[in-house]
Amino acid sequence: MKFKLIIFIIIIYIIKILKSEILNEFGYGLVDENLKCLSFIGDSNNQQLCNNKLINKQLIYSTINKSNQIQSLKMVEQSFKQLTFLQGKCLNLNFAQFGICDIYFPSCVETSFGISLPKRLCKSVCKQIVTDCPTLGVSLNCSDSNKFPTIGTLYNLTKYGYTENNGFYQVECSNPTNYYYNEINSTNNQFIEICPSPLVLRNQSDSKYGEDKGYTYLSPTNCVLGCPQPFFKNNKWVQMYKMSIVLSTLSFICSIYNIITFGLLSKLKSKYNLCITFFSVSTVLMSLMDIVTYGIGYEELLCPESGRYAIQSDVACGVTGAFFHIGITTGVLWWTTMSICLYSEVKRFKMISFRYIIIFNSVISLILLIIPLSGQAFMSGNGSLGCWIRKTWYANGTFWIPCGISLFIGAICIVLVIYEIFKISRNLSKDNKPLMFQIRPFLCVLLVGGSFLYLFIFYFNNERNLDKYKAAIPSYVQCLLSSDENGEDCLTDGPGFGAYFTFYFFTRLFGITSFSIYGTSKIARDIWFESAYNHPFFNPYIVKCLSLLGISKHFSSNSISGSNQKRFNRNGSNFNMKQNKSNPNDSISLSVVESTKKQDTENELESNIETKENRSTDISIENTTSSKDSNTNSF
């Protein structure tokens, strides 16, 4: 008898344990009389979400006005954005999307008591999602049986007259697995990628959206970076746009002035005049890029469509990029030529015929232009103010390496010139006038060369840090995913604004620098005065004004044309113009000093060096230091 009693107690205990275990497989839910079984509100017009991922779209647990569905759509969209950037890290993310849609839009059961109850996602489905993508385990707590029951959810409907199972109404859990595998091959049920603003979704498997078309994809997603790339906030980009067009316009005007002065009006075509003219032509071409870009619109030209930067096949980009490249390449070559000419004058060795230098610089510039053009290397890039070469090997091979070589040659010439000038100054006099005579050419060579050197250093420093910038992209994406301002407060890692601003500042300063040094010189003013005097329209007015003012003015043969000398004497209204014979091979000196009276003549010495092809000019360093050696070249 006792044995039977023990057996009975054990059976009762086991039943209680089993019942307890069974009950543990259920979750408990609250009843909300305000929620009903209604149809799915549907996806928004421009974004597919759960429309094809719900088991039963006609019975969704929802408020009467469906306001909770609107909020749920926002939550699903945010979840899909995060899943987009988990590609490559997780398996079967499409299945996770089915599960997420089921969580936010649970299926609904209508009871005979007029109460609507939701179906919760099965724990097995939750565990499968987390197993495929452990990262989601942070937001999905599969051990919570109230949210993810193993069998179903129990709802207490006692007060509604339900008496079975002690008043607990059982609703089985939702398992979309079978539905998922039935729909997996449907074209409407593929994994949905959503890119957070300002990233743009493109299909990179489509050739028209390939990277070579101007798209920068954030692998392994189909999201592309915005254009321009958010290195800085919008107001900073506006500052750079304004700086760019203002400096480029001024540089363009200054360069045109130099071309007219030293290339067209000046009667003497010396090598320094030619260097200044060709260098000014190069800065005109560089400035045209910004002027054309501004005319079209910076963002319109550089970013022709959302998420795409301009490439060479975009005509405006190809043309402006070619202008800028041949301009800056030619500028580097002519700067180097000026450095070599400066050194040749100091050392007094004869250079090759200048026509060969012109041919050499022109041919090299064209070759360095044709190579990137043939490789479709011109593009605006994600963060730039204009189109230029963006492919690394083309950029290095057709500009930066030649630029480095030119900078090296020019730097050597500068150092040697400084050494020679100091040596001459020390040997001839304690006076520093020989050095002061070279102030303008030194300024030109040093300032322009220093600008090119900064560009060189900035570029390669930027290239060196590219991996660091790329490594910071995930942080930028994470910022976008958590941003409440459409990503406007998020920035990618890149060059500092100051360094970036300075880089573009220097590339637009060359024309202004050249004008400040040469265009404002005494000789430039005299060239314009002589040209105006020789013009039949202006001549009578100039003669009359000089006569009325009683001005005596003298044009040195070395300071203007090298072939004539004009003297204006104070003789009331009488005006004399006196020809002075001089060797036609005499060259114009671009070194400027103040005029000094010597008997009847005022000799003007410009601060640029001018070579003599066959014999010395009338003014020399020895003249300055009272030496009588007439064969010494002028500095």
From Swiss-Prot:
The chain crosses the membrane at residues 245-265, 276-296, 315-335, 357-377, 399-419, 441-461, 497-517. Residues 32-166 form the FZ domain. Its main location: membrane. SUPFAM superfamilies: Family A G protein-coupled receptor-like, Frizzled cysteine-rich domain. It is a multi-pass membrane protein. Residues 594-623 form a coiled coil. Belongs to the G-protein coupled receptor Fz/Smo family. This is Frizzled and smoothened-like protein C. It comes from Dictyostelium discoideum. The lineage of its organism: Eukaryota, Amoebozoa, Evosea, Eumycetozoa, Dictyostelia.
